[in-house]
């Protein structure tokens, strides 16, 4: 059997996530992107067992910490980055989901510019929308921290981490990544994408 090196490693920090993790993994399984080119790293940060989630996707790797637990999402992401095999790292929280075209849309941008981020949607436990941006809304960098939701970029592995922990860490992590991006010019305003 030929082992395929993944193109994308998706890191999910896992803390008390038994009730939400299946939905997050399902959103990865529903990607239009080739599943054999995606690895999922569950970076565990509690004492719970998550082995049964391997039944949802053959490319799941479970990373159990060898030391201190409850270190926070930042440190859990850092541990995941260390073992990731993909050239691109995707970050997803255990209580978040991606639309089916997420990886197909963002990967070319991340490959070209080093990083890609998109707008977010917030759903409750039943999958009903609590918050979503209008389809025509132009999501810009200046909106970080002002809009509710998570911001989880696709980023080249060489630019990923290390991440601190703390309040508003999704925003802080994105800002830290943006500082590393070599391209800081705007593309035309009529474009579908904006580069900081």
Model-derived regions: residue spans:
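Conserved nucleotide-sugar donor-binding catalytic segment
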Residues: 138-196
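Short, acidic, metal-binding catalytic loop of nucleotide-sugar glycosyltransferases
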Residues: 26-37
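N-proximal low-complexity "stem/linker" segments adjacent to membrane-targeting elements
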Residues: 1-27
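Short aromatic/hydrophobic "clamp" motif used to bind/position activated sugar donors
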Residues: 89
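Acidic helix N-cap motif at the loop->helix transition within catalytic regions
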Residues: 47-56, 97, 101
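Short beta-strand/loop segment that forms part of the nucleotide-sugar
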Residues: 36-47, 63-66
């Amino acid at each position: 059997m030929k082992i395929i090196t993944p193109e994308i490693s998706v890191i999910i920090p896992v803390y008390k996530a038994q009730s939400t993790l299946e939905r997050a993994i399902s959103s990865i399984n529903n990607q239009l992107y080739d599943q054999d080119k995606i690895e999922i790293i569950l970076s565990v940060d509690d004492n719970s067992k998550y082995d049964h989630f391997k039944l949802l996707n053959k490319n799941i790797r479970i990373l159990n910490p060898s030391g201190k637990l409850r270190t926070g999402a930042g440190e859990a992401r850092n541990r995941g980055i260390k073992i990731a095999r993909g050239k691109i790292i995707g970050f997803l929280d255990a209580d978040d989901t991606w639309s089916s075209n997420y990886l197909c849309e963002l990967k070319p941008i991340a490959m070209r510019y080093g990083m890609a981020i998109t707008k977010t949607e917030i759903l409750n436990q039943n999958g009903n929308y609590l918050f979503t941006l209008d389809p025509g809304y132009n999501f810009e960098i200046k909106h970080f921290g002002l809009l509710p939701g998570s911001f989880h970029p696709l980023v080249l592995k060489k630019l990923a981490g290390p991440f601190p922990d703390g309040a508003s860490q999704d925003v802080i992590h994105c800002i830290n990544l943006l500082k590393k991006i070599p391209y800081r010019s705007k593309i035309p305003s009529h474009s579908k994408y904006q580069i900081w």
